[in-house]
Amino acid sequence: MIVRCLSAARRLHRVGGSGILLRMTLGREAMSPLQAMSSYTVDGRNVLRWDLSPEQIKRRTEELIAQTKQVYDDIGMLDIEEVTYENCLQALADVEVKYIVERTMLDFPQHVSSDKEVRAASTEADKRLSRFDIEMSMREDIFLRIVRLKETCDLGKIKPEARRYLEKSVKMGKRNGLHLPEQVQNEIKAMKKRMSELCIDFNKNLNEDDTFLVFSKAELGALPDDFIDSLEKTDDNKYKITLKYPHYFPVMKKCCIPETRRKMEMAFNTRCKEENTIILQELLPLRAKVAKLLGYSTHADFVLEMNTAKSTHHVTAFLDDLSQKLKPLGEAEREFILNLKKKECEEKGFEYDGKINAWDLHYYMTQTEELKYSVDQEILKEYFPIEVVTEGLLNIYQELLGLSFEQVTDAHVWNKSVTLYTVKDKATGEVLGQFYLDLYPREGKYNHAACFGLQPGCLLPDGSRMMSVAALVVNFSQPRAGRPSLLRHDEVRTYFHEFGHVMHQICAQTDFARFSGTNVETDFVEVPSQMLENWVWDTDSLRRLSKHYKDGSPITDDLLEKLVASRLVNTGLLTLRQIVLSKVDQSLHTNTSLDAASEYAKYCTEILGVAATPGTNMPATFGHLAGGYDGQYYGYLWSEVFSMDMFYSCFKKEGIMNPEVGMKYRNLILKPGGSLDGMDMLQNFLKREPNQKAFLMSRGLHAP
């Protein structure tokens, strides 16, 4: 997942809705107020600071707002007849960089700081800056000057990327309603501010949730000793189980006590139920109302206009068609699971209720994997200690993309467990960027897996290039005395996926911050990282990623073959669940009268064939709804069509570690960032229109 901040150039996926900001920036002539904060423009280095106190965050937020507003005001007062490319468009692009970097230092700590007061100050800064962003994005005076420039500028004399910047600026201005009457603009502005606050609060609630359940050892039946030994104990010798991934999924996959799994699933899908349900009940109608004012039928229509899918009709057809194709496979998988459950209930004396419950799904899918393919993830993870996986992952990416990584000693980081690496082009030695690895859970930390773009890789006012900086934030189990952090294979896949986003951030080399890194269409943004997941299903790559944590012995060929063969296990149910989430997202953003919990329950029954647990409200825990994937969750499946096409037609055909294909991928897919349309990049890479054949094959289906 790409987490995108409100800055349009980073587009962190948590804003009130849609990456809607025009992100008007300032003029060359009026840059002086920011010069004192702009030492990073000297050589484009990483100057991000992570030691700001709550007071400093608050003060610097107000300073940034005041200084930025002054420059906007100066730009807005330019005589409209004297607007030029240099004093308007280029000036806007130049100062955009400064604002983004300053903002990062203020709003990113809410996700990673160990200090609760710093997180709170950062969240408030994000809210304050988000309101300001909306104010600036609604500056009609600046919009009129950009429109004037487009009308008078000789577009043939400016670079294609600059022309794209100009055209998108006009387009985004209209999507902000700046062509509408002032009263309507003010109404939209007020609603956007409220939407932004609601989205920030929605995800803050999830991040700060510290719910835990207490179980006896008997209630944790069949869970491995190493997991139980890692748990915090209560005074009465019971065990605390949090709802964070490193606790939740092991329990749901391996605990043989149905009541324990039921309690965990119930708690997990009622996180923040009350407060986030209220937020959704306000947020969804606001989005719909803004879309209507802007001339769109629904919020989904509004956001899809800028994506490769283009319309709700195309998305609905794609999801319904895939659902129908997967229906027989899903039915067969459910039947197999139900038989497993019946047999186990008879053997262990549990009551058999004749159905698959939500808390049964992970458990019996894990059993299916073990029975059909003899893959025991508990044994397998002993070959994936995090240090070995990290070294192998970094080596594979370096070799594939023609890069070199070097760990920075004594790096300035936000937590002592975080590491920083510098990325260089292997052939030229040019520094392309840096990335942070933040791998372990902490209190208050962002609780999923994501890549954060922190500093855009783009041109500075003097023509030099600013290095790109990104952070990979995940939550793998903590190492402990005598035992390193051991990763399940699905965690290795997640690691590879998110690092693919990091490489997109680092390898993109654009002129404008707005197009840097992963600033592509939302239903294209997952393509590069999804494509790279294929490496963790390749035997040669897996050998490079694995070594037994005790004696360094290699993973056996037999175990490798079984793991690779298991790729299609449960693929019907797993894909149908993605369709459920995509359909819920589409429904909530096309019909605001729907109840989120009821809509989720409906699709769980109709499509997945596994009922949602009564009393839960999964959408209230669904961070994507308030994190920038609103109306766009389908993009995960949609983009797999493209990623699988690229992999099978090029990498699989030419060799997955073929450096020529790797450089072709780096140059044609990663390097352009968002300076080209996603479909154009795909056609440049494939030399043809993309098709679904490889995607359907990856799902165990035959292409027509």
UniProtKB/Swiss-Prot annotation:
GO cellular component term of the entry, any: mitochondrial intermembrane space
N6-acetyllysine modification sites are: 664
The record ties this protein, via InterPro entries, to: MetalloPept_cat_dom_sf, Neurolysin/TOP_dom2, Neurolysin/TOP_N, Pept_M3A_M3B, Pept_M3A_M3B_dom
Needed cofactors, names only, are: Zn(2+)
* Free-text tissue specificity from the UniProt record: Predominantly expressed in the liver, kidney and adrenal gland.
Binding-site residues for Zn(2+), renumbered to this chain: 497, 501, 504
The keyword Phosphoprotein is annotated on this UniProt entry: no
**Any one GO MF annotation of this record:** metal ion binding
Q: Which reaction does it catalyse?
A: Preferential cleavage in neurotensin: 10-Pro-|-Tyr-11
Q: Which Pfam families does the protein's record reference?
A: Peptidase_M3 (PF01432)
Cofactor remark: Binds 1 zinc ion per subunit.
Cited function: Hydrolyzes oligopeptides such as neurotensin, bradykinin and dynorphin A. Acts as a regulator of cannabinoid signaling pathway by mediating degradation of hemopressin, an antagonist peptide of the cannabinoid receptor CNR1.
Assigned protein family:
Belongs to the peptidase M3 family.
Its recorded name reads: Neurolysin, mitochondrial
> Which organism encodes this protein?
Sus scrofa
The root-end lineage is:
Eukaryota, Metazoa, Chordata, Craniata, Vertebrata
